């Protein structure tokens, strides 16, 4: 998917990018490739592949109608090189984006990236989701949490749901069908008062299958969740 293919596909979906937005995606790509020689950000560095498998894939929840251009508070867990939240932010500037990542070098990259792209209302924090999930400044503060290929739903639910407001939504982007994952996550979702409201499949323009699972938070998360760092992965609920 060339940049021109990317712009044209978005226009067909009703999103006509400004010259500024096109420049932001171009700068994003260049900085990603440059920094990838210093720290491991991605295995995908070829331009057409980045536009398809990072940029287009990241904004899929918007294209599929799961997010609007509103000043909601969105948290991205384990965003790595900023996916999916920063491409979303470029497309929908009204989003207020917070990223938590466990690697400080990635936070350094993201901070520079946001400055170079001129993004406002973006915040970056270094640390573990389990620790921030017990911090009152973060717990129960977000309208939406995104996670792209971070962990199986059984683990992901404990890492993300505590951050949501009641009726807030987890938007999980997956490369594989989530049916089996959701079956395994039934107990975790029950304990965390999360309800699956959508399990959506779609295709990238090249025909690759992708999946978006939407989980809504129904009640306050019990205080003991999330457990200490490492436990959700070691002993899933």
UniProtKB/Swiss-Prot annotation:
S-adenosyl-L-methionine binds at residues 78, 83, 129-130, 148. Its EC number is 2.1.1.-. Coiled coil: none annotated. Keywords: Cytoplasm, Methyltransferase, rRNA processing, S-adenosyl-L-methionine, Transferase. GO terms for cellular component: cytosol. It holds the Pfam family GidB. CDD domains: AdoMet_MTases (cd02440). One of its GO terms (molecular function) is rRNA (guanine-N7-)-methyltransferase activity. InterPro entries: rRNA_ssu_MeTfrase_G, SAM-dependent_MTases_sf. Belongs to the methyltransferase superfamily. RNA methyltransferase RsmG family. Specifically methylates the N7 position of a guanine in 16S rRNA. HAMAP family: 16SrRNA_methyltr_G. This is Ribosomal RNA small subunit methyltransferase G. It comes from Streptococcus pyogenes serotype M6 (strain ATCC BAA-946 / MGAS10394).
